[in-house]
């Protein structure tokens, strides 16, 4: 059984999966801090299903990019739950997890966007289930410039979709179902399973799980400016 969590954006979610099948999932987009909501949500999954924590054989979480605080909270909770158990801990790209529900869309550019502040988005591009770019921090203008060189329609998803839409100008946009716009822990679990199966010799220990930050945090920027 997989326990998967996502805290990379404004929403938070957790899920229990048996393979790719969802046993139970909890999702919250109420604007409450993840540190206050996630553990009660996880506990609620076990209460509702009657499953036990010793049934877990893999942990999965979004390792970034996204909210610095959110990613750190998710990593801390994952590592706390996994401590001493010797079970695989698999980190998943939040952008890839957001794009996953749309991998069956043919010849459409799947464009997950997360608000990175400071005039940028966290973004990656996918088409026909294949990754086209690495995860990156990019301006709306540069994102449009790259997309406008092709003729494929574009599907925006992620918590930055409404902010990114005005930059898309004359591009053909495909509407995404609103309940699929945000990353879901169930898709984090599915991706983690694929990653582990693709690397059967990988250990994926809790010590190897590392958050991915594409930019320095605000605190790190302030510290760097003071040193200059």
Predicted stretch roles:
Residues 1-65, 182:
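N-terminal beta-alpha supersecondary unit
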Residues 44, 84, 101, 128, ...:
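Active-site catalytic microenvironments for nucleophilic, acid-base chemistry
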Residues 60-94:
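DPxDG-like acidic metal-binding loop motif
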Residues 47-54, 82-92, 104, 199, ...:
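Phosphate-handling active-site elements
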Residues 21, 33, 88-183, 213, ...:
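Surface "functional belts" at beta-alpha junctions
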Residues 178-211:
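Glycine-rich phosphate-binding/hydrolytic loop that grips phosphoryl groups
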């Amino acid at each position: 059984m997989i326990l998967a969590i996502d805290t990379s954006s404004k929403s938070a979610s957790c899920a229990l999966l048996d393979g790719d099948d969802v046993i139970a999932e909890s999702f919250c987009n109420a604007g409450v801090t993840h540190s206050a909501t996630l553990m009660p949500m996880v506990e609620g999954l076990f209460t509702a299903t009657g499953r036990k924590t010793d049934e877990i054989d893999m942990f999965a979480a979004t390792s970034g990019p996204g909210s610095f605080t959110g990613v750190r909270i998710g990593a801390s909770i994952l590592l706390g739950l996994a401590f001493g158990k010797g079970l695989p801990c698999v980190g998943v790209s939040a952008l890839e997890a957001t794009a996953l529900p749309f991998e069956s869309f043919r010849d459409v550019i799947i464009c997950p966007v997360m608000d990175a502040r400071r005039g940028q988005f966290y973004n990656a591009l996918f088409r026909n289930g294949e990754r086209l770019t690495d995860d990156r921090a990019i301006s709306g203008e540069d994102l449009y410039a790259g997309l406008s060189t092709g003729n494929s329609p574009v599907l925006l998803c992620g918590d930055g979709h409404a902010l990114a839409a005005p930059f898309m100008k004359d591009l053909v946009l495909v509407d995404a179902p609103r309940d699929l716009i945000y990353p879901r822990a169930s898709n984090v679990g599915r991706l983690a399973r694929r990653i582990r199966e693709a690397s059967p010799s990988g250990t994926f220990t809790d010590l190897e799980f590392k958050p991915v930050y594409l930019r320095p945090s605000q605190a790190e920027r302030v510290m760097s400016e003071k040193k200059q």
